[in-house]
């Protein structure tokens, strides 16, 4: 605390001295110059005594013209500063340049190849089969008109076979008997065996089937030979076409008529039935 009290007056004193020095300097700078006394020159106005050039007295010298203000020289026009264009410096090409990778073109999906339609096979015309004359069975005297009979010993597998029709007679071997009737010619033959796999063979007849309308319009004719398998009791088991007429409509009509036909048989019998379609 004592030191602070001693320093404070000293600081104030030093600041005061600095101010006094500054005031003295300013006073010396602004001090007016003193005119020294010396010989005094007096100016006498000579205009009152008349002029020497014959001008009346009292006429003073002409007043000096007022100085005209000197015009200020024009300021030099500064030329427009040129606009500096930026200089583009190109770097020297590198010795080794990497080629730019070109974008690979996108692969377009290949169109699916449509399968070529297979050419349809041309339907070949079915040649008409040559009509064969139907062999007439040899007529033999029978015990009753229109009937045929054959007798044999039953122990040796012989049996009786009868058939009726417009024309027809014959003999057969085997167990049982068969009978056919209708409007077409029937033939009877002989066969051996008594099972479904080995039936008796005989000729028979069926009612004449209806002539198909389209076949009549197209003038379709021919003979169909059928193989009809008959079970014991006269039921038709199957009908097969042995020989076609060359026209499917005629074949189907004959087959349908055979399936609806009636046969008499006591054993498995296979009948061979010809059906002739003829337009008058």
UniProtKB/Swiss-Prot annotation:
GO terms for molecular function: energy transducer activity. The chain crosses the membrane at residues 6-27. It is a single-pass membrane protein. Pfam families: TonB_C. Keywords: Cell inner membrane, Cell membrane, Membrane, Protein transport, Signal-anchor, Transmembrane, Transmembrane helix, Transport, Virulence. Residues 1-5 are cytoplasmic. It is found in: Cell inner membrane. Its main location: membrane. Signal peptide: none annotated. Residues 165-184 have a biased composition (Gly residues). One of its GO terms (cellular component) is outer membrane-bounded periplasmic space. Residues 28-280 are periplasmic. Residues 90-143 have a biased composition (Basic and acidic residues). One of its GO terms (biological process) is transmembrane transport. Residues 196-280 form the TonB C-terminal domain. InterPro entries: TonB (IPR003538), TonB-dependent_transducer (IPR051045), TonB/TolA_C (IPR006260), TonB_C (IPR037682). The keyword DNA repair does not apply. Residues 64-83 have a biased composition (Pro residues). Residues 51-217 are annotated as: Disordered. The accessory proteins ExbB and ExbD seem to form a complex with TonB. Interacts with outer membrane receptor proteins that carry out high-affinity binding and energy dependent uptake into the periplasmic space of specific substrates. It could act to transduce energy from the cytoplasmic membrane to specific energy-requiring processes in the outer membrane, resulting in the release into the periplasm of ligands bound by these outer membrane proteins. Required for heme utilization and virulence. This is Protein TonB. It comes from Neisseria meningitidis serogroup A / serotype 4A (strain DSM 15465 / Z2491).
